[in-house]
């Protein structure tokens, strides 16, 4: 129901207020901030190559999906296997790896939660 209400508000705002609505996929609009930097420097989307470490879900809270839709591509890395399976399916132009990056070769514990954004190697 909430999605329907949001869609109606979106359509009404475009029709009645002539607003240009740009959708952000990032959690706090980081993709739109980066996009403004790219635009001000006249960087073409096809020339953008990203490296998304800790990519998470390929759509929800994604810092790179906005650019992927515009024609950019890159490498996504995430320790959560299910996220990488989704990346490979939903974003086939990207190269996706399922591993954990760190600054040592020690074996570490990976704590997995129902909300994957909370997954961590930290006990705290």
Residue ranges and their predicted role:
Residues 1-124:
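Phosphate/nucleotide-binding beta-alpha loop and adjacent structural elements of enzyme active sites
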């Amino acid at each position: 129901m909430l999605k329907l209400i949001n869609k109606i508000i979106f359509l009404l705002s475009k029709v009645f207020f002539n607003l240009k609505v740009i959708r952000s996929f990032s959690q706090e609009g980081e993709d739109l901030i980066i996009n403004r930097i790219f635009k001000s420097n006249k960087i073409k989307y096809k020339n953008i190559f990203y490296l998304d470490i800790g990519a998470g879900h390929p759509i929800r809270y994604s810092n790179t999906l906005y650019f992927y839709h515009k024609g950019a591509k890159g490498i996504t890395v995430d320790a959560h296997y299910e996220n990488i399976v989704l990346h490979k399916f939903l974003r086939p132009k990207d190269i996706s790896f399922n591993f954990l990056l760190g600054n040592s070769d020690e074996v570490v514990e990976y704590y997995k939660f129902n909300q994957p954004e909370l997954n961590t190697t930290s006990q705290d």
